[in-house]
Curated annotation (Swiss-Prot):
This is Fructose-1,6-bisphosphatase. The Pro/N-degron targets the protein for proteasomal degradation when cells are shifted to glucose-containing growth medium. Binds 3 Mg(2+) ions per subunit. Its cofactor is Mg(2+). One of its GO terms (biological process) is gluconeogenesis. The modification Phosphoserine is found at residue 12. It comes from Saccharomyces cerevisiae (strain ATCC 204508 / S288c) (Baker's yeast). The lineage of its organism: Eukaryota, Fungi, Dikarya, Ascomycota, Saccharomycotina. AMP binds at residues 27-31, 38-42, 122-123, 150. Subject to complex allosteric regulation. The enzyme can assume an active R-state, or an inactive T-state. Intermediate conformations may exist. AMP acts as allosteric inhibitor. AMP binding affects the turnover of bound substrate and not the affinity for substrate.
């Protein structure tokens, strides 16, 4: 007689888990929740995970194959392009085109959006292929950040599909390439974290239902820009350095890597706040809305945190007028962001 296996998972033996949840399994389980699902969204996520694996592999070999260093050009936003920036951009363009489903791609490395006319799907992806690449020479963790929009009804793929309010995203994620490769993903119903098992070649669910601590006295900001901040920002940062009544009369601790993905990932796990305010050098902010501020804000809110700009406006309520529009950002534990909002008179 055959053995029928159903119901709850079988317990693993000797501490070795044989019933792991891979990213494809996770995505398929999510798809099953929607009776009319076509599978298109699953293909979008599959294309993204392939690109993350490809970039991860390439970064680990970068020094060996002479991919570290400047490519001798600047991208549209004015950043000096590294060789890996160029290669990462190519990886994402090819992966999104090969999906057959993704119609529109916005990349930090491209001045204009890219439309794939032969693709038949209804999704747009906005990404920073390799965020923090200036840190690669020093071996600092870098990452990829991406947001996903569903195309507007009857659209064949235009700029209007992405110049939309941040809360219209259907998914957001980032991959961090460090001692291991981590993927943090939201599909709009919470946040889950995965770690790449290089032997299996699969992202494994390691941080289910990721929640940011509601309060933690840690701040992450580039204080080298203090001279260029306005008085409101400067006085707030000085305030958190003073003894805090809700932190046993101890000041905030400072933690700053200089790679947004690494700093935000630490903030997710331990709590606190991450900020990149406007300053005299960047009066409109430094971080791009579509592929940096929006996805990180979406992830943060889905994990129980908050994300606002210097004026206290919710990041996801903003609407860009250009694909490379920038913004200031304050994100992290709700308790710490509330302190900033109180400071600027925007209590929520």
């Amino acid at each position: 007689m055959p053995t029928l296996v159903n119901g709850p998972r079988r317990d693993s033996t000797e501490g070795f888990d044989t019933d792991i949840i891979t990213l494809p399994r996770f995505i398929i389980e999510h798809q099953k929740q929607f009776k009319n699902a076509t599978g298109d969204f699953t293909l979008v996520l599959n294309a993204l995970q392939f690109a993350f694996k490809f970039v991860s592999h390439t970064i680990r070999r970068a020094e060996l194959v002479n991919l570290v260093g400047l490519a001798g050009a600047s991208n549209f936003t004015g950043d000096q392009q590294k060789k890996l920036d160029v290669l990462g951009d190519e990886i994402f363009i090819n992966a999104m085109r090969a999906s057959g489903i993704i119609k529109v791609l916005v990349s930090e490395e491209q001045e204009d959006l890219i439309v794939f006319p032969t693709n038949t799907g209804s999704y747009a992806v906005c990404c920073d292929p390799i965020d923090g690449s200036s840190n690669l020479d020093a071996g600092v963790s870098v990452g990829t950040i991406a947001s996903i929009f569903r195309l507007l009804p009857d659209s064949s793929g235009t700029i209007n599909d992405v110049l939309r309010c941040g809360k219209e995203m259907v998914a957001a994620c980032y991959a961090m390439y460090g001692s291991s490769t981590h993927l943090v993903l939201t599909l709009g119903d919470g946040v889950d974290g995965f770690t790449l098992d290089t032997n299996l070649g699969e992202f494994i669910l390691t941080h289910p239902n990721l929640r940011i601590p509601p309060q933690k006295a840690i701040y992450s900001i580039n204080e080298g820009n203090t001279l260029y901040w306005n008085e409101t920002i400067r006085t707030f940062i000085e305030k958190v350095k003073q003894p805090q009544a809700d932190n046993n009369n101890k000041p905030f601790s400072a933690r700053y890597v200089g790679s947004m993905v690494a700093d935000v990932h630490r903030t997710f796990l331990y709590g606190g706040l991450f900020a990149y305010p406007c300053d005299k050098k960047s009066p409109n902010g430094k971080l791009r809305l579509l592929y940096e501020a929006f996805p990180m804000a979406f992830l943060m809110e889905q994990a129980g945190g908050k994300a606002v700009n210097d004026r206290g406006e919710r990041i996801l309520d903003l609407v860009p007028s250009h694909i490379h529009d920038k913004s200031s950002i304050w994100l992290g534990s709700s308790g710490e962001i509330d302190k900033f909002l109180d400071h600027i008179g925007k209590s929520q």
